[in-house]
A protein has these predicted regions:
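Alpha4 helix (beta4-alpha4-beta5 surface) of REC/receiver domains from two-component response regulators
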Residues: 66, 87-105, 114
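Acidic, metal-coordinating helix/loop segments flanking the phosphotransfer/catalytic sites
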Residues: 34-52
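Conserved acidic segment of CheY-like receiver
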Residues: 6-17, 22, 53, 71
Protein backbone atom coordinates (compact mmCIF):
# COMPACT_ATOMS: atom_id res chain seq x y z
CA UNK A 1 0.00 0.00 0.00
CA UNK A 2 1.52 3.33 -1.00
CA UNK A 3 2.02 5.94 1.70
CA UNK A 4 -0.52 8.29 0.16
CA UNK A 5 -3.12 5.52 0.23
CA UNK A 6 -2.77 4.65 3.90
CA UNK A 7 -5.97 4.91 5.89
CA UNK A 8 -5.95 7.39 8.75
CA UNK A 9 -6.46 6.38 12.36
CA UNK A 10 -6.30 8.20 15.69
CA UNK A 11 -4.28 6.86 18.58
CA UNK A 12 -4.95 8.36 22.02
CA UNK A 13 -2.61 7.09 24.73
CA UNK A 14 -1.38 8.98 27.79
CA UNK A 15 1.86 7.04 28.20
CA UNK A 16 4.36 8.45 25.71
CA UNK A 17 6.49 5.29 25.52
CA UNK A 18 3.46 3.11 24.82
CA UNK A 19 2.21 5.71 22.32
CA UNK A 20 5.53 5.58 20.46
CA UNK A 21 5.60 1.77 20.39
CA UNK A 22 2.04 1.52 19.10
CA UNK A 23 2.51 4.35 16.60
CA UNK A 24 5.65 2.76 15.15
CA UNK A 25 3.90 -0.56 14.58
CA UNK A 26 0.61 0.87 13.32
CA UNK A 27 2.45 3.18 10.91
CA UNK A 28 3.37 0.13 8.85
CA UNK A 29 -0.23 0.07 7.56
CA UNK A 30 -1.83 3.35 8.63
CA UNK A 31 -1.31 7.09 8.77
CA UNK A 32 -1.38 7.44 12.56
CA UNK A 33 -2.29 10.69 14.27
CA UNK A 34 -1.12 10.27 17.85
CA UNK A 35 -2.28 12.19 20.91
CA UNK A 36 -1.42 12.02 24.61
CA UNK A 37 -4.64 13.85 25.54
CA UNK A 38 -7.94 14.79 23.91
CA UNK A 39 -6.88 18.25 22.65
CA UNK A 40 -7.38 18.42 18.89
CA UNK A 41 -8.93 14.98 18.53
CA UNK A 42 -12.48 16.13 17.68
CA UNK A 43 -11.09 18.59 15.16
CA UNK A 44 -9.26 15.77 13.39
CA UNK A 45 -12.39 13.63 13.40
CA UNK A 46 -14.29 16.52 11.79
CA UNK A 47 -11.74 17.36 9.11
CA UNK A 48 -10.29 13.97 8.19
CA UNK A 49 -11.56 10.59 7.06
CA UNK A 50 -10.62 8.73 10.22
CA UNK A 51 -11.13 4.99 9.85
CA UNK A 52 -10.63 3.98 13.50
CA UNK A 53 -9.90 5.40 16.94
CA UNK A 54 -7.68 3.57 19.41
CA UNK A 55 -8.02 4.95 22.91
CA UNK A 56 -6.86 4.37 26.45
CA UNK A 57 -9.95 5.54 28.39
CA UNK A 58 -7.82 6.66 31.32
CA UNK A 59 -6.33 9.34 29.06
CA UNK A 60 -7.12 12.82 30.32
CA UNK A 61 -8.08 11.80 33.87
CA UNK A 62 -10.48 9.08 32.86
CA UNK A 63 -12.59 11.13 30.46
CA UNK A 64 -11.98 8.67 27.66
CA UNK A 65 -15.33 6.92 28.16
CA UNK A 66 -17.17 10.23 27.88
CA UNK A 67 -15.18 10.98 24.76
CA UNK A 68 -16.20 7.66 23.19
CA UNK A 69 -19.83 8.61 23.74
CA UNK A 70 -19.15 12.08 22.29
CA UNK A 71 -17.80 10.53 19.09
CA UNK A 72 -21.07 8.67 18.58
CA UNK A 73 -23.18 11.72 19.39
CA UNK A 74 -21.17 14.14 17.21
CA UNK A 75 -20.81 11.79 14.22
CA UNK A 76 -24.02 9.73 14.07
CA UNK A 77 -23.73 9.20 10.30
CA UNK A 78 -20.19 7.84 10.50
CA UNK A 79 -19.47 4.39 11.79
CA UNK A 80 -16.06 4.98 13.32
CA UNK A 81 -14.72 1.82 14.96
CA UNK A 82 -13.41 2.34 18.48
CA UNK A 83 -10.71 0.08 19.87
CA UNK A 84 -10.19 0.39 23.62
CA UNK A 85 -6.72 -0.57 24.77
CA UNK A 86 -6.76 -0.18 28.53
CA UNK A 87 -4.92 -1.09 31.70
CA UNK A 88 -8.31 -1.71 33.34
CA UNK A 89 -10.46 -4.67 32.42
CA UNK A 90 -13.84 -2.99 32.16
CA UNK A 91 -15.03 -4.96 29.15
CA UNK A 92 -17.79 -6.66 31.15
CA UNK A 93 -19.15 -3.46 32.75
CA UNK A 94 -21.25 -2.42 29.74
CA UNK A 95 -19.23 0.76 29.33
CA UNK A 96 -18.22 -0.27 25.86
CA UNK A 97 -21.52 -0.27 24.03
CA UNK A 98 -19.90 1.78 21.24
CA UNK A 99 -16.65 -0.21 21.28
CA UNK A 100 -15.65 -2.48 18.40
CA UNK A 101 -12.91 -4.23 20.37
CA UNK A 102 -11.61 -4.20 23.94
CA UNK A 103 -8.00 -5.11 24.65
CA UNK A 104 -6.58 -5.29 28.17
CA UNK A 105 -2.94 -4.29 28.58
CA UNK A 106 -0.30 -5.43 28.28
CA UNK A 107 -0.99 -5.54 24.54
CA UNK A 108 1.83 -6.20 22.12
CA UNK A 109 2.06 -3.63 19.34
CA UNK A 110 1.76 -6.41 16.75
CA UNK A 111 -1.47 -7.65 18.39
CA UNK A 112 -2.96 -4.15 18.29
CA UNK A 113 -1.89 -3.79 14.65
CA UNK A 114 -3.52 -7.08 13.66
CA UNK A 115 -6.75 -6.24 15.52
CA UNK A 116 -6.89 -2.79 13.91
CA UNK A 117 -6.39 -4.26 10.42
CA UNK A 118 -9.16 -6.79 11.11
CA UNK A 119 -11.61 -4.15 12.27
CA UNK A 120 -10.87 -1.59 9.56
CA UNK A 121 -11.17 -4.20 6.79
CA UNK A 122 -14.51 -5.54 8.05
Amino acid sequence: MAKSQKLEILLIEKDEITLELYQRELSKSFNVMAFTDLDGVLENLTRRDIRAVIIEPETCTGQGWDFINTIHKEFPDRSIPIIVCSTRDESSQNRGKHVSSYLTKPVLPKTLHEKTLEIVKS
